[in-house]
Amino acid sequence: YYAQDFFDENKITVENQALGGMSSRTFYTRLWPDVRKGIQKGDWVIISIGHNDNGPYDSGRARASIPGIGKDTLNVTIKETGVKETVYTYGEYLRKYINDCRAVGANPILMSLTPRDAYDENGKIVRVNKTFGLWARQVAEQENVPFVDLNEISAAKLDKYGPWKEKYHFYTDHIHTSRFGAMMNARSAAEGIAESKDPKLALLQAM
């Protein structure tokens, strides 16, 4: 939400295709086919996903991806439905999004996850720079696409606010943000794009 507030509305239209509860796997299999139909040449596609990539592979919500960025696969049968599915790594799902965007001439951008309301032993917001953030960065480097460390940018802001202010940026589940948190993350994403040294973002930076 609110990303449109940080771009020139005369130059760019922002469409938010996110849906709560999706993982890199379930968004790709369930929602991406329709989203992909609307992507056109020259579009910019921001990909930031992974909060729900844990859990069971073959039961319940069955939305987990395999950790990492390798080429590992897992063939599963969903217990509740009997549907068979091949599960890929988190990084491989990111590559699928990237390849699909490039196939129609669109410009993918990878961003690390928005931070959770969780603290380390020093009272700082926990980063994902050893898991999903690292994997997104690695895939971006491998595929030569822009990467914005949204997790770090927003977490640094929350660290400055302190716990008494941070609580106003999240709901009680410690994951979903309030209006204030959503605005902060949108601003962080825009700042990450604006301050990037990646020449591939030069055109978007002008918008």
Predicted ranges, named:
Residues Y1-E9:
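Short catalytic helix/loop segments, enriched in acidic residues and glycine
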Residues A3, V14-Q17, A182:
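Generic structural hydrophobic/aromatic packing signal, biased to beta-strands
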Residues N10-S23:
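A short beta-strand-loop structural module common to alpha/beta enzyme folds
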Residues K11, L204-M207:
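Short, conserved aromatic-histidine micro-motifs
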Residues S23-D34:
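N-terminal post-signal-peptidase region of extra-cytosolic proteins
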Residues P33-R179, M183, S188-Q205:
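Alpha-helical cap/lid subdomain in secreted, periplasmic
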